[in-house]
């Protein structure tokens, strides 16, 4: 570890925090339908879209209607993605003449991008046409990201409103999010990436002659436009198989820093939106503080583990830490930081191979996902995931003092706690259940690239990543099989929607409650005590849930590596 390395981490954190308030102010006004600097340009477009779709922007929805609209929207999205992938060979913008995607792979990919997971059992440049990348994937990157933000806004309204039956209008929210938030950022962002050296073309792949005289085909395409929303929307699916480790997908140190920044910025800003909408910005800062504590611990451990290397490397006289699977142009600190950022959020993009991290270094991204990616998290999903843990923490605190739990003026009762537990328990049920099945089925075991604890970690990582809607992977696992295409798609679908439905039920329940004025017995929720309480509940619930599985994988692998019995 170096002083310069810690300075890079500190600079990243400082820039994220500096952007929280201005973006929070802007997003609050967008979803409240108030004036913004872009209103004169975009309001006519917004109004035209409502008229074309027959949507009344003043008509709000009950939580169940809101949720059903979201589900119908996703059914349509799935149909479009699947159809484009299966008909790819017949559609235009296919200069490499890619064939139709196999049914099971198309199903897996459609569910993957629908749920904001972007798990990829294929190499983009060798499997998909430009039209598939743009119409099926990039298009869905915008919509899945907007959906996450919209769902977070619905839950925020549940906390901020009183004695009402509605939590907003799904169609209005998703239109405003796409028009006013995602597109205005992604357009200049994509131009910045082109300036940094990223391709943006519909031209054919380039045939080149290397210095040795060999022929090589260089894949290009509409990369910058996809990468911009891939990062901002915490989608993560790469245009190229190597994802952000590819020089065309992440050309420079500056593009690497900005891509990490874009992964975090909207999720962090939503904590400020929460504070503004409930009338107390300190509440938002407290939630961001919980996220910050967990993030700092994670990056400290990951950076230390990768910079320290392994006992085997030390015995060979190799100094400088573990550089296996990392780009020299980024080094250890930028690779470790990217890994923690991409799994603290539900992004899943990678600029290094997580499978090549040390056992302890690779365990941190795994833990981030197993906690539910609540450390900033996916756009929207991180905030509503964190608020579920806040509900449980407030409930525990209420039990300790013998009072009905309250949070920001709303009583937390049995219905909210049951729904929160249902949403939280979905993740371990999926990733532990499918992992247990996969490690005993011969056909699934055959896909493992390694035996022993690391092979177990590969399978556990895959199902954790799918259930948490992350999409990153330990690359040693061959995922493009019928078993993994089907089971990972199931994990992605359940992990997304079985968390959303209980969350929306909580939003509807809270919106119908009266505001309770604070009293002498009300737990303060803006200070260090509250931050510590929430962190403690997260670690206790998480530790009890996934520690046994970690003990079979990365922990025993780390112990073996330290004893020089396993590299």
From Swiss-Prot:
Keyword Transport: yes
Alphabetic keyword roster: Cell inner membrane, Cell membrane, Ion transport, Membrane, Potassium, Potassium transport, Transmembrane, Transmembrane helix, Transport
Pfam family, one: KdpA
GO molecular function terms attached to this record: P-type potassium transmembrane transporter activity; potassium ion binding
Primary site of residence: membrane
Transmembrane segments: 3-23, 64-84, 136-156, 179-199, 254-274, 285-305, 330-350, 357-376, 421-441, 473-495, 527-547
Subcellular localization, as worded in the UniProt entry: Cell inner membrane
Membrane topology classification: Multi-pass membrane protein
Keyword Cell membrane set for record: yes
Cleavable signal peptide: none
Cited function: Part of the high-affinity ATP-driven potassium transport (or Kdp) system, which catalyzes the hydrolysis of ATP coupled with the electrogenic transport of potassium into the cytoplasm. This subunit binds the periplasmic potassium ions and delivers the ions to the membrane domain of KdpB through an intramembrane tunnel.
Protein name (Swiss-Prot/TrEMBL): Potassium-transporting ATPase potassium-binding subunit
Organism: Rhodopseudomonas palustris (strain ATCC BAA-98 / CGA009)
Taxonomic lineage from the root: Bacteria, Pseudomonadati, Pseudomonadota, Alphaproteobacteria, Hyphomicrobiales
């Amino acid at each position: 570890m170096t002083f310069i390395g810690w300075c890079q981490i500190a600079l990243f954190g400082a820039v994220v925090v500096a952007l929280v308030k201005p973006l929070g102010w802007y997003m609050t006004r967008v979803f409240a339908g108030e004036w913004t600097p872009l209103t004169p340009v975009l309001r006519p477009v917004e109004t035209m879209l409502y008229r074309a779709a027959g949507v009344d922007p003043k008509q709000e929805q009950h939580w169940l209607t809101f949720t059903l609209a979201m589900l119908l929207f996703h059914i349509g999205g799935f149909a479009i993605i699947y159809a484009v992938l299966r008909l790819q060979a017949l559609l235009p913008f296919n200069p490499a003449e890619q064939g139709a995607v196999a049914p099971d792979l198309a199903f897996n990919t459609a569910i993957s991008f629908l749920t904001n997971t972007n798990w990829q059992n294929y190499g983009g440049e060798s499997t998909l046409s430009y039209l598939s990348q743009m119409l099926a994937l990039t298009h869905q990157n915008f919509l899945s990201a907007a959906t996450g933000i919209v769902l977070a806004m619905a839950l925020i309204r549940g906390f901020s409103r009183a004695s009402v039956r509605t939590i907003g209008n799904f169609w209005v929210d998703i239109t405003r999010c796409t028009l006013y938030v995602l597109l205005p950022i992604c357009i200049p962002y994509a131009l910045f990436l082109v300036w940094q050296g990223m391709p943006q073309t519909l031209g054919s792949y380039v045939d080149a002659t290397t210095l040795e005289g060999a022929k090589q085909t260089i894949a290009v395409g509409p990369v910058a436009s996809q990468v911009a929303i891939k990062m901002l929307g915490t989608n993560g699916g790469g245009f190229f198989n190597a994802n952000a480790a590819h020089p065309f997908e992440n050309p420079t140190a500056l593009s690497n820093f900005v891509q990490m920044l874009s992964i975090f910025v909207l999720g962090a800003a939503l904590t400020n939106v929460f504070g503004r909408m409930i009338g107390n910005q300190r509440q938002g800062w407290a939630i961001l503080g919980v996220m910050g504590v967990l993030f700092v611990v994670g990056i400290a451990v990951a950076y230390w583990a990768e910079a320290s290397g392994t006992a085997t490397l030390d015995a060979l006289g190799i100094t400088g830490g573990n550089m296996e699977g990392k780009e020299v142009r980024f080094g250890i600190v930028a690779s470790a930081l990217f890994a923690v950022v991409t799994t603290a959020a539900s992004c899943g993009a990678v600029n290094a191979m997580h499978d090549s991290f040390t056992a302890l270094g690779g365990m941190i991204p795994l833990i981030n996902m197993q906690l539910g990616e609540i450390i900033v998290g996916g756009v929207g999903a991180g905030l509503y995931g964190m608020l579920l843990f806040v509900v449980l923490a407030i409930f525990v605190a209420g039990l300790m003092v013998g009072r009905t739990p309250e949070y920001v003026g709303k009583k937390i009762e049995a219905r909210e706690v049951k729904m929160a537990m249902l949403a939280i328990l979905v993740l371990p049920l999926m990733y532990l259940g499918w992992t247990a099945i996969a490690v005993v089925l011969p056909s699934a075991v055959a896909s493992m690239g390694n035996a022993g604890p690391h092979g177990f970690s590969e399978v556990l990582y895959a199902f954790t990543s799918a259930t948490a809607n992350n999409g990153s992977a330990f690359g040693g696992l061959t995922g493009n099989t019928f078993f993994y295409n089907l089971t990972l798609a199931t994990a992605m679908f359940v992990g997304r929607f079985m968390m959303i439905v209980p969350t929306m039920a909580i939003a509807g329940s809270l919106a119908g409650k009266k505001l309770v004025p604070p009293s002498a017995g009300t737990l303060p929720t803006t200070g260090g005590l509250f931050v510590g309480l929430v962190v403690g509940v997260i670690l206790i619930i998480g530790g009890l849930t996934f520690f046994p599985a970690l003990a079979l994988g990365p922990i025993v692998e780390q112990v073996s590596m330290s004893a020089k019995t396993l590299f």
